[in-house]
């Protein structure tokens, strides 16, 4: 339904089943399907985007590497990171891909601002940064005018696996997280703020929250 949004809180999930579910949702949706945002916390995994190069995998060790069809290069997902998958009909919302990327970046910037953290986007490297350290990664895929994949915001996680890769293809890219910046360390304190900021930017009028048990 237009101007309506469903928020699904999926809890902690492995990456591959969630990826498959996104594909199924996107393939089966119709022009009347309500847009959704999925909130999830993944078990440790490296994901390679469509532009991913093996030389950016430095020492993955025992953490699995999964090929993904999102844009971008390699990143890490793990507990303590808020992942939001943005499953919306761009044509119905009259959005271009660049518009959506900008909206997502501004959603994160506005969310961090609510917690007293000043951040910015960069024209040369999608995502959100605090003092040149990356706090949020972003990667999307568009199919039949609809988006899937989304953002990964570091809240309170083990950042050391990022040292095993060149994050998003940038050697030496430093990472940071909200808990290191005097922000909250609990995902459930950040999720509603992120959703509120996203719905304001995309002008949704009706929001339904669904929490799914693991």
UniProtKB/Swiss-Prot annotation:
Q: What is its main location?
A: cytoplasm
- Domain called BPL/LPL catalytic: residue spans: 31-206
HAMAP family, per database record: LipB
Keyword terms of this UniProt record = Acyltransferase, Cytoplasm, Transferase
Q: Catalytic center at which residues?
A: 168 (acyl-thioester intermediate)
Query: Residues that bind substrate, according to the entry?
Result: 70-77, 137-139, 150-152
Family as reported in the entry's similarity comment: Belongs to the LipB family.
Identify the pathway.
Protein modification; protein lipoylation via endogenous pathway; protein N(6)-(lipoyl)lysine from octanoyl-[acyl-carrier-protein]: step 1/2
EC number(s) of the enzyme?
2.3.1.181
Q: Where in the cell is it found?
A: Cytoplasm
Biological process according to GO: protein modification process
Q: What does this protein do?
A: Catalyzes the transfer of endogenously produced octanoic acid from octanoyl-acyl-carrier-protein onto the lipoyl domains of lipoate-dependent enzymes. Lipoyl-ACP can also act as a substrate although octanoyl-ACP is likely to be the physiological substrate.
Catalysed transformations (reactions): octanoyl-[ACP] + L-lysyl-[protein] = N(6)-octanoyl-L-lysyl-[protein] + holo-[ACP] + H(+)
GO cellular component labels: cytoplasm
Q: What is the lineage of its organism?
A: Bacteria, Pseudomonadati, Pseudomonadota, Gammaproteobacteria, Vibrionales
The first-level EC class reads transferase
One GO molecular function term of this record is: lipoyl(octanoyl) transferase activity
- NCBIfam families found in the cross-reference section: lipB, PRK14342.1
Q: Where along the sequence does the record put site: Lowers pKa of active site Cys?
A: 134
Gene3D superfamilies associated with the record: Bira Bifunctional Protein, Domain 2 (3.30.930.10)
What other facts are recorded? In the reaction, the free carboxyl group of octanoic acid is attached via an amide linkage to the epsilon-amino group of a specific lysine residue of lipoyl domains of lipoate-dependent enzymes.
Q: Per its record, how is this protein called by name?
A: Octanoyltransferase
Q: Does the keyword Ribosomal protein apply?
A: no
Organism, by scientific name, is Photobacterium profundum (strain SS9)
Asked if the record carries the keyword Transferase, the reply is: yes
